[in-house]
Curated annotation (Swiss-Prot):
<dbReference type="GO" id="GO:0005739">
    <property type="term" value="C:mitochondrion"/>
</dbReference>
<feature type="binding site">
    <location>
        <position position="159"/>
    </location>
    <ligand>
        <name>Zn(2+)</name>
    </ligand>
</feature>
<feature type="binding site">
    <location>
        <position position="211"/>
    </location>
    <ligand>
        <name>Zn(2+)</name>
    </ligand>
</feature>
<dbReference type="GO" id="GO:0017136">
    <property type="term" value="F:histone deacetylase activity, NAD-dependent"/>
</dbReference>
<keyword id="KW-0156">Chromatin regulator</keyword>
<dbReference type="InterPro" id="IPR003000">
    <property type="entry name" value="Sirtuin"/>
</dbReference>
<dbReference type="InterPro" id="IPR029035">
    <property type="entry name" value="DHS-like_NAD/FAD-binding_dom"/>
</dbReference>
<dbReference type="GO" id="GO:0046872">
    <property type="term" value="F:metal ion binding"/>
</dbReference>
<keyword id="KW-0809">Transit peptide</keyword>
<dbReference type="InterPro" id="IPR050134">
    <property type="entry name" value="NAD-dep_sirtuin_deacylases"/>
</dbReference>
<dbReference type="GO" id="GO:0005694">
    <property type="term" value="C:chromosome"/>
</dbReference>
<feature type="transit peptide" description="Mitochondrion">
    <location>
        <begin position="1"/>
        <end position="26"/>
    </location>
</feature>
<feature type="binding site">
    <location>
        <position position="214"/>
    </location>
    <ligand>
        <name>Zn(2+)</name>
    </ligand>
</feature>
<comment type="subunit">
    <text>Interacts with LAT1; the interaction is direct.</text>
</comment>
<comment type="function">
    <text>NAD-dependent protein-lysine deacylase that decrotonylates the PDC (pyruvate dehydrogenase complex) subunit LAT1 at 'Lys-148' to inhibit PDC activity and consequently ATP production. Also decrotonylates histone H3 crotonylated at 'Lys-18' (H3K18cr), to repress the expression of genes involved in aerobic respiration. May also act as a NAD-dependent deacetylase. Does not mediate desuccinylation, demalonylation, or deglutarylation of LAT1.</text>
</comment>
<keyword id="KW-0158">Chromosome</keyword>
<feature type="binding site">
    <location>
        <position position="100"/>
    </location>
    <ligand>
        <name>substrate</name>
    </ligand>
</feature>
Amino acid sequence: MRLLRPTPRLSSIFSSKTATSNLRFFTAMAPHNDVGAFHEALRSSKRILALCGAGLSASSGLPTFRGAGGLWRNHDATSLATLSAFKNDPGLVWLFYNYRRHMCLRAEPNPAHYALAALAEKNKDFLCLTQNVDNLSQQAGHPQDQLRTLHGSLFDIKCTNCDWIQRGNYDDPFCPALAPASVDVEPGKPFPLLDASLPLDPISPDDIPKCPQCKIGFQRPGVVWFGENLDEVMMMGITNWLLEDKVDLMLVIGTSAQVYPAAGYIDKAKRKGARIAVINPEAENEEEMYKVKPGDFAFGKDAAEYLPLLLEPVIGKLETDKKERS
């Protein structure tokens, strides 16, 4: 299955009159943001699936590259996440990804990461699918066998030509030519690399490391770019998990669910009987409310703030000192 670009919001298909009518209909029902009702649903749920997006890590200080914040040096961030962009200018693409690696290496998991890790420890029938490539879920102690990194990892390195792969590369910068993307600045001061008005010295392809195995291909970030296939073995494992039994509850966290095939898991979970709970700042916006079906939940909150509260009946009070102890 290939990673597809974000689809237009389905709400654009409907007229404003229809959207308003749908909103009135759902408002008349039991509150979609009733924490007590969600707690009851959580307590009665055995098999739980989660789909996480960039919003999960936003409170850790990582940019989501969505909406108004979707530009990097005046480049649409999604336009840099393609193999064709890498072939056209590997230095520019690597600067973008080295910057992201640098930011992730300095970020720390937030309470939402820890809450999901705690849920995994308490419930062995919980499976988390993350679209994030930042490694923060792993840092929070999320059990590896209950975590699927759909889009790979910034800290894996692949070859553009052969099957060579290196896992767990934390070099910062990745290579000397990328040092401008690994600069630390004082809080409140601008990062020079992000100032599009400042000229950017081009990076020669000769400065990008070649594959140590085939000696032909370039080393590239081990993430899934738009148009590329997701890991087939991982995808088959997720399908098998879905087929094993009914799904009681699905958490959709920090994502507007516009990128496929990941977004398709929401419909698959519904077909297996799952109630859907969306935790995302835009979840209660009028243009999103048409998605909230009877019995489902929508919490227009930041995951770091709200997820520990929502999961509290199962995980208990989240320890505030976990960060210092980890």
